[in-house]
């Protein structure tokens, strides 16, 4: 059976650079790897084909021979077929270690080739903090208490009882990973005995039960700057769980949420407030007093003939912009309130007004009903 062209197998041009070959190979190897296609014979064949093509084209001398003679260069009596040495195994191990292990490579546990047991970074923590809109306006310092874990002082984070120490894992030789043969190919997996640490604790510390960490509650002060918005995340570096074996601590992420306000709605740095006004004030004009987010009050002049939903802008009375000197605006939207529970005299006065009113007093409604009449008249004419 004839072999496919190696360039065709990798899906690259004959002028492809070394980096282009490597990218194509990694992509195809991921797709056809036997561990990702268990029991799929076709995938296994394609995987071997991809490996063979890359081994040839990634070697300068073999590629030159292949470009000149094709597959005949590696037939019996030729230059020799592409091999799969230890260097290739190490290279492929680097590619697949994050896919077929448990993620204990960098920056966490495990150990490098020939190195000491790796440091393990502490876990990140999350804290949800709810504040008021006024606190978001002015900023504040909040003291919080968080449950976390710190390095055990009794064993200095090793997990071993005082006077003893962890021993090198006999299963993986302290490497933290073991190799499993997959046909002609070797795949690395996290060691099932030491779980990637490279060490085993035979006599665990009684204070932490061999975990190397103990649970504690910590008190922290969080600076909430003025102008924060709902959903903002504050990162406190190194304030998460302690690392193991000298590893760095994780981070603490504080997620802010802002309580609903009884008066104000927020849109970015701008605030909106709906204020009811009397029918008389709307008709004759007047002044109303409205609240401001800083706790003060301000006056708004209502002109005669103001309608519901009319909006008034008060510049510079909104929220501060985070890490800026800019400030948003306050928008007052009025709602004309229809009077209720009228006395006899009040009803009489309104009836007198209605009898004396003309379309000039209600231009919007007069215009609307005029359009309605025109609509029906034109409809009747067409019929």
From Swiss-Prot:
GO terms for biological process: chaperone cofactor-dependent protein refolding; DNA replication; protein refolding; response to heat. It is found in: Cytoplasm. Pfam families: DnaJ, DnaJ_C, DnaJ_CXXCXGXG. Its cofactor is Zn(2+). Residues 5-70 form the J domain. GO terms for cellular component: cytoplasm. PROSITE patterns: DNAJ_1, DNAJ_2, ZF_CR. Gene3D superfamilies: DnaJ domain (1.10.287.110), Heat shock protein DnaJ, cysteine-rich domain (2.10.230.10), Urease metallochaperone UreE, N-terminal domain (2.60.260.20). InterPro entries: DnaJ, DnaJ_C, DnaJ_domain, DnaJ_domain_CS, HSP40/DnaJ_pept-bd, HSP_DnaJ_Cys-rich_dom, HSP_DnaJ_Cys-rich_dom_sf, J_dom_sf. Zn(2+) 1 binds at residues 152, 155, 205, 208. Keywords: Chaperone, Cytoplasm, DNA replication, Metal-binding, Repeat, Stress response, Zinc, Zinc-finger. Zn(2+) 2 binds at residues 169, 172, 191, 194. A zinc finger (CR-type) spans 139-217. Binds 2 Zn(2+) ions per monomer. GO terms for molecular function: ATP binding; heat shock protein binding; unfolded protein binding; zinc ion binding. SMART domains: DnaJ. It comes from the Bacteria. Homodimer. Participates actively in the response to hyperosmotic and heat shock by preventing the aggregation of stress-denatured proteins and by disaggregating proteins, also in an autonomous, DnaK-independent fashion. Unfolded proteins bind initially to DnaJ; upon interaction with the DnaJ-bound protein, DnaK hydrolyzes its bound ATP, resulting in the formation of a stable complex. GrpE releases ADP from DnaK; ATP binding to DnaK triggers the release of the substrate protein, thus completing the reaction cycle. PANTHER family: CHAPERONE PROTEIN DNAJ, DNAJ HOMOLOG 1, MITOCHONDRIAL-RELATED. NCBIfam families: DnaJ_bact, PRK10767.1. The J domain is necessary and sufficient to stimulate DnaK ATPase activity. Zinc center 1 plays an important role in the autonomous, DnaK-independent chaperone activity of DnaJ. Zinc center 2 is essential for interaction with DnaK and for DnaJ activity. This is Chaperone protein DnaJ. It comes from Methylorubrum populi (strain ATCC BAA-705 / NCIMB 13946 / BJ001) (Methylobacterium populi). The gene is dnaJ.
